[in-house]
Protein backbone atom coordinates (compact mmCIF):
# COMPACT_ATOMS: atom_id res chain seq x y z
CA UNK A 1 0.00 0.00 0.00
CA UNK A 2 2.90 2.36 0.67
CA UNK A 3 4.08 1.94 -2.93
CA UNK A 4 0.63 2.86 -4.24
CA UNK A 5 0.58 5.93 -1.99
CA UNK A 6 4.00 7.16 -3.10
CA UNK A 7 3.16 6.55 -6.75
CA UNK A 8 0.01 8.64 -6.33
CA UNK A 9 1.94 11.38 -4.51
CA UNK A 10 4.40 11.61 -7.41
CA UNK A 11 1.41 12.38 -9.63
CA UNK A 12 -0.02 14.91 -7.15
CA UNK A 13 3.37 16.56 -6.71
CA UNK A 14 3.68 17.00 -10.46
CA UNK A 15 0.09 18.28 -10.77
CA UNK A 16 0.81 21.12 -8.34
CA UNK A 17 4.24 21.95 -9.84
CA UNK A 18 6.03 21.58 -6.51
CA UNK A 19 9.77 21.61 -5.84
CA UNK A 20 11.71 18.34 -5.93
CA UNK A 21 12.67 18.74 -2.29
CA UNK A 22 9.00 18.78 -1.31
CA UNK A 23 8.44 15.27 -2.67
CA UNK A 24 11.47 13.82 -0.91
CA UNK A 25 10.64 15.48 2.40
CA UNK A 26 7.07 14.17 2.09
CA UNK A 27 8.31 10.59 1.70
CA UNK A 28 10.72 11.07 4.61
CA UNK A 29 7.85 12.21 6.84
CA UNK A 30 5.65 9.31 5.76
CA UNK A 31 8.33 6.70 6.42
CA UNK A 32 9.30 8.26 9.74
CA UNK A 33 5.67 8.25 10.87
CA UNK A 34 5.02 4.68 9.72
CA UNK A 35 8.09 3.44 11.58
CA UNK A 36 6.85 5.06 14.79
CA UNK A 37 3.08 4.63 14.70
CA UNK A 38 0.68 2.01 13.26
CA UNK A 39 -1.96 3.32 10.90
CA UNK A 40 -5.11 1.89 9.38
CA UNK A 41 -5.09 1.29 5.65
CA UNK A 42 -8.07 3.63 5.27
CA UNK A 43 -6.02 6.49 6.72
CA UNK A 44 -2.90 5.99 4.59
CA UNK A 45 -3.92 8.48 1.91
CA UNK A 46 -4.73 11.00 4.63
CA UNK A 47 -1.22 10.51 6.02
CA UNK A 48 0.23 11.15 2.57
CA UNK A 49 -1.75 14.34 2.00
CA UNK A 50 -0.95 15.66 5.48
CA UNK A 51 2.76 14.90 5.01
CA UNK A 52 2.67 16.72 1.67
CA UNK A 53 0.97 19.71 3.30
CA UNK A 54 3.64 19.87 6.01
CA UNK A 55 6.42 19.64 3.41
CA UNK A 56 4.85 22.37 1.30
CA UNK A 57 4.88 24.73 4.27
CA UNK A 58 8.60 24.06 4.69
CA UNK A 59 9.67 24.11 1.05
CA UNK A 60 7.26 26.16 -1.03
CA UNK A 61 6.36 29.83 -1.35
CA UNK A 62 3.03 29.06 -2.98
CA UNK A 63 1.42 25.73 -2.22
CA UNK A 64 -1.97 23.95 -2.38
CA UNK A 65 -4.54 25.02 0.16
CA UNK A 66 -6.39 22.55 2.37
CA UNK A 67 -9.50 22.51 0.17
CA UNK A 68 -7.36 21.61 -2.87
CA UNK A 69 -5.76 18.72 -1.02
CA UNK A 70 -9.16 17.51 0.11
CA UNK A 71 -10.35 17.68 -3.50
CA UNK A 72 -7.56 15.43 -4.79
CA UNK A 73 -8.71 12.71 -2.39
CA UNK A 74 -12.14 12.85 -4.06
CA UNK A 75 -13.68 13.94 -0.78
CA UNK A 76 -12.46 10.89 1.15
CA UNK A 77 -11.63 13.16 4.08
CA UNK A 78 -12.72 16.51 5.48
CA UNK A 79 -10.68 19.53 6.52
CA UNK A 80 -10.80 18.65 10.22
CA UNK A 81 -9.34 15.20 9.57
CA UNK A 82 -6.45 16.66 7.59
CA UNK A 83 -5.65 19.20 10.30
CA UNK A 84 -5.86 16.51 12.97
CA UNK A 85 -3.50 14.22 11.03
CA UNK A 86 -1.08 17.09 10.45
CA UNK A 87 -0.96 17.79 14.19
CA UNK A 88 -0.58 14.10 15.00
CA UNK A 89 2.36 13.71 12.62
CA UNK A 90 4.14 16.67 14.20
CA UNK A 91 3.45 15.28 17.67
CA UNK A 92 4.65 11.75 16.89
CA UNK A 93 7.77 12.98 15.10
CA UNK A 94 8.38 15.73 17.67
CA UNK A 95 8.73 18.19 14.78
CA UNK A 96 11.72 16.25 13.40
CA UNK A 97 10.44 16.54 9.87
CA UNK A 98 13.51 17.72 7.96
CA UNK A 99 16.40 15.58 6.80
CA UNK A 100 18.96 15.75 3.97
CA UNK A 101 17.39 14.31 0.83
CA UNK A 102 18.75 12.33 -2.10
CA UNK A 103 17.93 15.13 -4.54
CA UNK A 104 20.15 17.54 -2.62
CA UNK A 105 23.15 15.21 -2.85
CA UNK A 106 22.39 14.46 -6.48
CA UNK A 107 22.22 18.15 -7.35
CA UNK A 108 25.68 18.68 -5.86
CA UNK A 109 27.09 15.80 -7.90
CA UNK A 110 25.35 16.73 -11.15
CA UNK A 111 26.84 20.22 -10.95
CA UNK A 112 30.29 18.92 -10.00
CA UNK A 113 30.36 16.62 -13.04
CA UNK A 114 28.56 19.00 -15.41
CA UNK A 115 25.68 16.70 -16.28
CA UNK A 116 23.75 17.84 -19.31
CA UNK A 117 19.97 18.15 -19.15
CA UNK A 118 19.23 14.60 -20.29
CA UNK A 119 21.75 13.13 -17.84
CA UNK A 120 20.27 15.21 -15.04
CA UNK A 121 16.73 14.03 -15.78
CA UNK A 122 17.90 10.42 -15.99
CA UNK A 123 19.21 10.64 -12.44
CA UNK A 124 15.95 12.17 -11.25
CA UNK A 125 14.07 9.34 -12.93
CA UNK A 126 16.21 6.79 -11.12
CA UNK A 127 15.79 8.55 -7.78
CA UNK A 128 12.02 8.88 -7.96
CA UNK A 129 11.81 5.23 -8.96
CA UNK A 130 13.71 4.36 -5.80
CA UNK A 131 11.14 6.22 -3.68
CA UNK A 132 8.48 3.66 -4.58
CA UNK A 133 10.23 0.63 -3.08
CA UNK A 134 10.21 0.53 0.72
CA UNK A 135 13.32 -1.67 0.73
CA UNK A 136 15.38 1.28 -0.48
CA UNK A 137 15.04 3.12 2.82
CA UNK A 138 17.88 0.96 4.13
CA UNK A 139 20.14 3.32 2.17
CA UNK A 140 20.86 6.85 3.33
CA UNK A 141 19.92 9.84 1.21
CA UNK A 142 23.57 10.38 0.32
CA UNK A 143 23.95 6.78 -0.88
CA UNK A 144 20.84 7.07 -3.08
CA UNK A 145 22.00 10.39 -4.52
CA UNK A 146 25.52 9.14 -5.25
CA UNK A 147 24.32 5.77 -6.58
CA UNK A 148 21.88 7.38 -9.00
CA UNK A 149 24.67 9.61 -10.26
CA UNK A 150 26.84 6.51 -10.61
CA UNK A 151 24.17 4.79 -12.73
CA UNK A 152 23.86 7.88 -14.94
CA UNK A 153 27.61 8.05 -15.47
CA UNK A 154 27.92 4.36 -16.30
CA UNK A 155 24.84 4.49 -18.55
CA UNK A 156 26.11 7.54 -20.43
CA UNK A 157 29.73 6.43 -20.63
CA UNK A 158 31.15 9.12 -18.35
CA UNK A 159 34.51 7.61 -17.44
CA UNK A 160 35.41 9.63 -14.36
CA UNK A 161 32.69 7.96 -12.27
CA UNK A 162 35.40 6.62 -9.94
CA UNK A 163 35.69 10.13 -8.52
CA UNK A 164 32.32 9.47 -6.87
CA UNK A 165 34.07 7.19 -4.39
CA UNK A 166 35.85 10.20 -2.96
CA UNK A 167 34.38 12.13 -0.05
CA UNK A 168 35.33 15.33 -1.88
CA UNK A 169 32.01 15.31 -3.74
CA UNK A 170 29.46 14.95 -0.94
CA UNK A 171 31.73 15.39 2.11
CA UNK A 172 31.15 11.76 3.02
CA UNK A 173 33.18 8.71 2.09
CA UNK A 174 30.79 6.00 0.91
CA UNK A 175 32.22 2.50 0.36
CA UNK A 176 32.45 1.49 -3.29
CA UNK A 177 30.65 -1.75 -2.46
CA UNK A 178 27.63 0.12 -1.07
CA UNK A 179 27.36 2.40 -4.11
CA UNK A 180 27.46 -0.54 -6.51
CA UNK A 181 24.96 -2.55 -4.47
CA UNK A 182 22.48 0.34 -4.35
CA UNK A 183 23.06 1.03 -8.05
CA UNK A 184 22.20 -2.57 -8.94
CA UNK A 185 18.96 -2.36 -6.98
CA UNK A 186 18.05 0.95 -8.61
CA UNK A 187 18.65 -0.53 -12.08
CA UNK A 188 16.47 -3.49 -11.18
CA UNK A 189 13.66 -1.20 -10.02
CA UNK A 190 13.80 0.92 -13.16
CA UNK A 191 13.89 -2.15 -15.41
CA UNK A 192 10.71 -3.47 -13.81
CA UNK A 193 8.80 -0.19 -14.13
CA UNK A 194 7.65 -0.92 -17.66
CA UNK A 195 5.71 -3.95 -16.39
CA UNK A 196 4.50 -2.36 -13.16
CA UNK A 197 0.98 -1.19 -12.40
CA UNK A 198 2.56 1.82 -10.70
CA UNK A 199 2.93 4.19 -13.63
CA UNK A 200 3.31 7.71 -12.24
CA UNK A 201 7.12 7.96 -12.29
CA UNK A 202 7.51 6.31 -15.68
CA UNK A 203 4.68 8.36 -17.21
CA UNK A 204 6.13 11.57 -15.80
CA UNK A 205 9.58 10.94 -17.24
CA UNK A 206 8.13 9.88 -20.58
CA UNK A 207 6.96 13.47 -21.11
CA UNK A 208 8.78 15.75 -23.60
CA UNK A 209 9.58 18.27 -20.87
CA UNK A 210 11.74 15.58 -19.25
CA UNK A 211 13.20 14.66 -22.65
CA UNK A 212 11.39 11.30 -22.63
CA UNK A 213 14.20 9.83 -20.51
CA UNK A 214 12.09 6.88 -19.34
CA UNK A 215 11.69 5.70 -22.92
CA UNK A 216 15.30 6.57 -23.72
CA UNK A 217 16.37 4.40 -20.80
CA UNK A 218 14.27 1.45 -22.01
CA UNK A 219 15.56 1.73 -25.56
CA UNK A 220 19.19 1.75 -24.49
Question: Which residues are covered by each model-predicted region?
Answer:
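Acidic, serine/threonine-rich low-complexity regulatory regions at protein termini
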Residues: 1-49, 53-220
Amino acid sequence: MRAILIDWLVEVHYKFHLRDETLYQTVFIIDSYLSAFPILRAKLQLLGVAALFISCKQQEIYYPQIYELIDITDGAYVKEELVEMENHILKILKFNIVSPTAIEFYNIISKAFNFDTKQYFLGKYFMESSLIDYQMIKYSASVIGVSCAYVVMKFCGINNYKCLYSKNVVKEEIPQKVIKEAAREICHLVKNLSNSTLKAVRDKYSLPQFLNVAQYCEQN
